[in-house]
Amino acid sequence: MKRVLSFALSLVMLLSITGGLGLTAYAGDTYYETEDNDDYSSADYVPVNSTIYGVCREYDPDWYKFTLSSPAKVNVQFSFNRADADGVWHVIVYKYDGDGDYSQIDDKNVYLYDGTYTFPSMGLPAGTYFVRVYGDYAACGRQYGVTPKCSYVSNWETEFNDSYTAADPLNFGKTRYGVCRDYDPDWYKFKLNAAATVSVSFSHTKSSADGVWHVIVYLSLIHI
């Protein structure tokens, strides 16, 4: 269950929520994959807010990369022409950790009969990111597009805020937005310099779907 959430705030306290080939590139342009982009080291570069098009052959993973110069809200869009056929692309988003290592951030099986898919908003730190695309069945041989949509904003969570030591700061009277993925706790913190009455507002868009957020407020007994 993935939904946008927000905070409004009116002793240090913590809040936990669970729920490559070289191209001359300019944002907003259109690009095409260059084979063989079959692993992260040969990933095709695509600037944020631009689209790169590719075609998966059988047993042919395609890798793409984009970079963020500073923390940003990112939505990766995977687009194609919908068809009533049995085909699927396996799309995975990774963060590059350096030294040949990368961490999975999100993934989705995108079916040909479902149409274009946009990943939920992610608040990501500056760095290099990869998108891996692998097609099966009727998805092979069909063109798709990958667009890393990016907005440089300061009011979104920054992954990976998965523990109290990496908690995102909250400012009083300001709203901060985030998205919980499966098994992805989000932590936030705010600090009081003197005793005060504080209310924490947790807001989201109402839906008839079956979902729940577990929201816990903690008092930190250590200096962080």
Question: What residues fall within each predicted segment?
Answer:
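Hydrophobic core
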Residues: 9, 13-17
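Extracellular beta-strand-rich recognition modules
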Residues: 76-78, 129-135, 200
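Extended, low-complexity, turn-rich repeat/linker tracts enriched in Gly/Pro/Ser/Thr and Asp/Glu
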Residues: 80-88, 138-140, 204-212
